Amino acid sequence: MENMFRRVIFEKKALDYPMGRDILRQFENTDIEIRYSETGRITGIPGKDEAQSFFEGKNTLVVGVRRELDFQTCKPSANYQLPIVSGCAAMCEYCYLNTHGGKKPYVKINVNLDDILSKAGEYIEKRKPDITVFEGAAISDPVPVERYSGALKKAIEYFGKNEYSRFRFVTKYADISELLAVQHNNHTTIRFSINTPRVIKNYEHRTSSLEDRIESAYNILNSGYKTGFIVGPVFLYENWKKEYEELLKKASDKLGDKELEFEIISHRFTTSAKNKILKVFPNTKLPMDDEARKFKFGQFGYGKYVYDKDDMQEIKEFFINNINLYFNKATIKYII
């Protein structure tokens, strides 16, 4: 995977940790700009307008220390978020993180990983004998920066040694070769977000191809991990059924007889997300016509535009029928 970043900003305290010093060594003697923050405040990322600020933020890696060690909950997919990375290097036009990362949404690696995992251990102890599940990709895609941090590898090993814990994350990236030989003890699930080639080309900028994601899922399974696919967001456009069936068939050609879990997520958007997207991607082709959708209040107190009842029924019937057709041992966790 090519380097995605134009600049790296190190919090001074990050250099007190072995991971911080190791990451610095990796960027020394390269053409990537290195800066330092004495206070931990991240400044100096250029941007004359909202669009430029967004893209320059995406091209910035921050190496810092996680100060707040209490974990956020992550229901229904897990008990807690595991805050090893925040922000995402991908530039998916539809992403809900577009409204959560500020005007300059940089990627941050937290180098005090031992402290974070120790805190995870406290949560595990409190919930014993129940299993505690941690989600590593709630506010990030951690795979693009794994080459610098090794944090996923260490987390997988940590949870693999604890019978009362499980770890899971999802990615749009295929660069998982360094995780294949990790001692995971079948405690980690690595899922892949997939979509039609049309959607990937138009909206999922700076991510791996569909073919590479499927190949990586195959390699993950062969290394003993559990895996699955998030198909989403599902868009209803001309010939959508044909293209999504081709997507499922392509995955089936490689994984049709494997145990997989599917999560199907239809496209939805909020007014604030739409306004942000139109500023950053003024020529976007995203279907965001309020009149063509149903308005629905969400659990967090704000409303979103979703497909109506008839469209959702069509989506559910399509994916249930075709997943059952192309996959022998697949389960569908949800279709929303």
Swiss-Prot record:
Cofactor: [4Fe-4S] cluster; S-adenosyl-L-methionine
Alphabetized Gene3D superfamilies for the sequence: 3.40.50.12110, 3.80.30.30
Molecular function, one GO term: DNA binding
SUPFAM superfamilies found in the cross-reference section: Radical SAM enzymes
An annotated GO BP: sporulation resulting in formation of a cellular spore
Cofactor note: Binds 1 [4Fe-4S] cluster per subunit. The cluster is coordinated with 3 cysteines and an exchangeable S-adenosyl-L-methionine. Binds 1 S-adenosyl-L-methionine per subunit.
Summary of the function given for this chain in its UniProt record: Involved in repair of UV radiation-induced DNA damage during spore germination. Can repair thymine dimer 5-thyminyl-5,6-dihydrothymine (known as spore photoproduct (SP)) by in situ monomerization of SP to two thymines.
Oligomeric form and interacting partners: Monomer or homodimer.
Protein known as: Spore photoproduct lyase
Species annotation: Clostridium acetobutylicum (strain ATCC 824 / DSM 792 / JCM 1419 / IAM 19013 / LMG 5710 / NBRC 13948 / NRRL B-527 / VKM B-1787 / 2291 / W)
Upper lineage: Bacteria, Bacillati, Bacillota, Clostridia, Eubacteriales
